[in-house]
Structure formats: C-alpha cells, structure tokens
Regions:
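Charged, compositionally biased N-terminal leader segments and the immediate start
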Residues: 1-9
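A polyanion-binding, active-site-adjacent surface
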Residues: 8, 12, 16-18, 23-254
Length: 254
C-alpha cells in the first residue's frame, strides 16, 4: 500500500474518532499492553481498533454524517470521478438503521438528483423494503463510490480506494446490524472477493473493516432483477431478504 493511501486512510480514521469524541486510540497487538497515541496523523499506522468507540446518539450521528457529506464528500477530488459528476451521492436514510443497503455507485438519475437508488431500480428496491416490513426511511442506503462512473461502468480500484474510508465511516457511525449488498460489483468491493454474485448470494459473509464486523448478505441488484424478472430470480432475492430479517429476529414474511 503506497504512502499516500496510508495517509488518507489514517486521516479518515482520525476524523471519525474526533466525531465520536475519541482523543486517543489503541494500536498494535491487542494481546499486548495497548500503546496509546494521540489522534494526530501518524504516517504508517493503520491498525486502529473501533471496539472502544462510544455508541453515538441519533443527533450525534446526524451531525457526523452531515459533516462528512458537506465538508468532505461534496468537495472530494481524490479520484477522476469528480471530473464529470453533476453532484455527489452520499447516501440517505435512518442513522439508527438496523439494515444498510449498499450498491455499487450512482447512475444517471442518482447523479442528477443526488440521491441513491431512484428511478426504476429505486422503485423496485422500495417495494422490496416494504415487503420486508420497513419503509425506505427506516433503512439506510448508500453506494461504494459517491460519484457516478462514466457510462455507469464498474468503479476502478483506485476509485474504490478513494471512497472506501467514507463508506467505512458511514458504517461505523450508523452501526447497522446487517448489510445487504446489491449486485456483484458491490459485493466484491465490500467483501474484497473475486467470487461472482451467483456463488456468494444466499450465504452470510462479514464486512471486517470495522470492529465488530458486520454480517453481510449479498443479493442481486434491482437493475438485474428488472432485466431478468423471472420467478426463480425473484425467489432468490426474497430468500436473501428473509435471511436478513431472520438475522434481525423478525421472522419470515409471506
């Protein structure tokens, strides 16, 4: 990992720590006596633990998310995606959400409106959320990258790296009990796997960039389901969503 990326990740960790009221963080081997370092940039240090971070109240979460969006994401120029965007798409929803949906990146409609999952894919996702017994405002919806890739292509590795800290901090602040990734690219990027969506959907995985790790259920993207709207595919997605509900102790729905 190059020095610039290490420094960016470090700064992103430190910004989150300050928002959460932490002035010092333990680094190094957890089995050894923890070495405390002040929350100032220290090049080369990446082994931060979030286990001791305090749970934020709702208004604190809103403030932290709003500050990240307005002061960092909207003006971000960390990768080439900033060059052609209309606006950034930070994410939206309940800061206390038990379920967080994560897609790959904004499309044209999202870029124009500044909101995740609008248009036909968003309509289908809204219906899926309602079928689970929630409203859109009950969950949190975000993307791996916050700017639209040209022609809706899959984000490149350096683009994902540039945005990875934003997503990690969103997850740290919201602390969802379950993450549902939407589509193969999102699952690969969140989980760091090369496996295709047809092989990993329907089974539980973990997002380990935060502590404690968050259970992840990959499923098909709504756009794919619209293109391949078969009874079999709909049943697979519904099975994945039911698994998430059961994980939350909600039990299956009809």
């Amino acid at each position: 990992m190059d020095a610039m990326r290490r420094m960016r990740i470090l700064k992103q960790h430190l910004k989150t720590d300050r928002l959460l009221g932490v002035s010092a963080v333990p680094v190094g081997d957890a089995a050894a006596t923890a070495t405390m370092v002040q929350a100032e940039p220290q090049p080369g240090r990446e082994a931060f633990s979030t286990a001791s971070l305090p749970v934020m109240k709702r208004d604190q979460k809103i403030q932290a998310l709003t500050q990240m969006d307005e002061q960092e994401v909207r003006g971000c120029t960390a990768c080439v995606l900033c060059e052609n965007r209309i606006q950034t798409v930070f994410g939206e929803g309940n800061p206390d959400a038990s379920i967080m949906f994560i897609g790959e990146g904004p499309g044209q409609s999202e870029d124009e409106q500044g909101r995740p999952f609008v248009g036909r894919s968003g309509d289908l996702l809204d219906k899926q959320i309602q079928a689970m017994g929630f409203k859109r405002s009950d969950v949190y919806i975000a993307n791996v990258v916050k700017c639209r890739p040209p022609n809706n292509r899959t984000p490149l590795a350096d683009e994902v790296d540039a945005c990875s800290g934003y997503l990690r901090r969103q997850i740290e602040i919201i602390r969802p009990k379950v993450i549902i990734t939407l589509g193969g690219p999102a699952a690969k990027l969140v989980l760091g796997t090369a496996e295709g969506i047809t092989r990993i959907r329907g089974t539980w995985h973990e997002y380990t960039a935060v502590n404690p790790p968050v259970p992840v259920m990959p499923t098909f993207h709504p756009a794919y389901l619209l293109r391949q709207y078969t009874k079999e595919n709909r049943a697979k997605v519904w099975s994945d969503l039911q698994a998430a509900m059961e994980r939350l102790g909600l039990g299956p729905r009809g």
